[in-house]
């Protein structure tokens, strides 16, 4: 890929966290760095271990390949490779690759002298992953409660985990997370549509300005968050969507153990209508 004209002045030494100048170089448009090397190492090793697991399983169908965690009765012990140990090693590789990628993002931010918003945002995704495969299983006392690495099997795990607690649709944290995901998609669609409409005015008109964009939303809903504000809002919505989605799993089986539909009886038994004749309680 060609080096863009403005990029060369930003390719300066320094800003590394580990390794000094040893890996402080670029390959084409890609910055390497120490954590780029560790990302490649962990990702490659994890991928090869998945292939090994597929060979042990006896299938090369991507939809059927599945690496299962150790059985629940194994607890938090290290398992044999063919009894879930392979899943444990792949989890270490995935965690190492994700964290290395985030730290590589930190080094790039340091080189450019910009804020750490991108690695912070990516770290929220890492937190969600670790919640499912490390934090929640450790709180429940067994790696067997983590999800398997497979297309269909991980979907089965999602379904089974949801129905273990009655119906996850009644999980208030699940409600909040899903609502925020929908809101994030809505905000992104509105923002993207607004920018494209300003950049592609009707024939004969010049490109519109941010003032036009602000005025549109003030006319539409009485307020415009602004060109910078919409990106702050989008980041806030997206981070909260991931955080509360992780929380909906984290509290299930660790803090709350019953059916999520039963959790809502506090609403049914509120004094406003609990004893009302013909009311919600009959």
Swiss-Prot record:
GO terms for cellular component: plasma membrane light-harvesting complex; plasma membrane-derived chromatophore membrane. It is found in: Cellular chromatophore membrane. GO terms for biological process: photosynthetic electron transport in photosystem II. (7R,8Z)-bacteriochlorophyll b binds at residues 154, 174. Fe cation binds at residues 191, 231. GO terms for molecular function: bacteriochlorophyll binding; electron transporter, transferring electrons within the cyclic electron transport pathway of photosynthesis activity; metal ion binding. The chain crosses the membrane at residues 33-56, 85-113, 116-141, 171-200, 226-252. InterPro entries: Photo_II_D1/D2_sf, Photo_RC_L, Photo_RC_L/M, Photo_RC_L/M_CS. It is a multi-pass membrane protein. A ubiquinone binds at residue 217. It comes from the Bacteria. Keywords: Bacteriochlorophyll, Chlorophyll, Chromophore, Electron transport, Iron, Magnesium, Membrane, Metal-binding, Photosynthesis, Reaction center, Transmembrane, Transmembrane helix, Transport. Signal peptide: none annotated. NCBIfam families: pufL (TIGR01157). Belongs to the reaction center PufL/M/PsbA/D family. Reaction center is composed of four bacteriochlorophylls, two bacteriopheophytins, two ubiquinones, one iron, and three highly hydrophobic polypeptide chains (designated L, M, and H). The reaction center is a membrane-bound complex that mediates the initial photochemical event in the electron transfer process of photosynthesis. This is Reaction center protein L chain.
